[in-house]
Amino acid sequence: PTGSGKPSLLNVLSGRVPAGGILSGEVTVNGQARSEDFNERVAYVMQEELLFAFLTVHETFMLHARLRLPPSTPDKEKAESVDRLIAELGLKNVRDSPVGSPGGFRRGLSGGERKRCNIGVEMVHDPAAIFLDEPTSGLDSFQAQNVMSALRDLAGNGRSVVCTIHQPRSSIFAMFDQLMLLTDGRLAFIGDASAAVGYFETLMFKCPTLTNPADFFMDVMSMDFRSESREGNSRSRVDFFAREAASRGLGEAAASKALESVALAKRQGAFDGEKEETTSAKSPGGAGWATQFYLLSQRAHKCQRRDVVGVGVTVFLDVVYALLLSALYRGVGDDQEGVQNRLGCLFFICLNLAYSSALPSINLFAAEKNIVIREQASGAYATSAYYLSKLVAELPKLSSKFVFCTLVYWIVGFNPDPTRYLNFLLIVICEC
């Protein structure tokens, strides 16, 4: 249920405890402590789809493949890997379509396609396990079914898929192999998903016939705060589930069963610890700094070039403001009043350049902040490479400032000496 601690548990399991968070106990993988490169071996997909609207699905995947796969991997092999992943996620029909943005501001993928694209971004380095925070959130039942079917296929290809989910439909619930039920931050059940209904029957809570088990679990495990009596009853019920799970040792039994499965796989030769240690993470370290800078610069230039409306509006406003400013100060004299007017004109030039240069950049960094945080948490690139790539990508925008300053300079009638004009432009460029 809502507020049961699902995202917190997922963050702990995936090794992404927020800064300042306090963790007691330990997390083990196959009975052993997590290795230093654990985060490189797993993928974490956030609930929010954090993607660049102007890139296509293929471009998005290829960028992350080039950033996160080893430099020794040929581009042809990376492209083939990306195409296989696109096919696995059912995105072949939108391979070359722009991702777009939610709400239809920039048209692109549907909600379910965006979810699958968001998953694919974290799958390009072929992780051994993938953690997902409510991958069906905000989707209709059909799109949710498609997303979970894609995840089921990924699990069938030898990957471990761990996801939190809120009130799935019955057909989605039937896809689960293992199930953990949390209530009020405590364990209520863990084990085979097919055994959950029977377990609750032993507690005298029987799932009605023709009822979705997930809906039944939500009903009996949720806290009801509509009145004190209902809160007390639901609190007693939740405490009962937590006590029973603890007294029956469900957590210990599930852990023991998992370790037995690993031991059996080792005996049968299906699991080679040494081999897994060297091959489960394909990326011992992705692209170098120079490659990161080049790829991020390419991405920034593509997004800027394809934002036709944004670029057009910027140029249009610069030209309009230049003409208005020129109309106000055109033909000023060389007397004391004219000098003061020229100083006023220069002040407005500086003011326009300062605001028109700074505000778009501030808005851009704010818009991309969450994407960058997600990508850096995955180890995609260095902060310095991203920052410098954005600076380089902003250079073409100086052309509109060049037009603005040129129009104002010559229409108003500043010093016609070419050297003075070039000095003026140099100062303007430095200010931008």
Stretch-by-stretch model annotation:
Residues S141-F142:
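Helix N-cap at the start of a conserved alpha-helix in ABC-type nucleotide-binding domains
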Residues S4, E36-D37, E48-E59, S72-T73:
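Conserved catalytic motifs of ABC-family nucleotide-binding domains
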Residues I119-G120, V147:
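Hydrophobic anchor residue at the start of the ABC signature
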Residues N11-V17:
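Helix-to-loop junction immediately C-terminal to a conserved catalytic motif
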Residues I130-E134:
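Catalytic Walker B motif of ABC-type/P-loop ATPase nucleotide-binding domains
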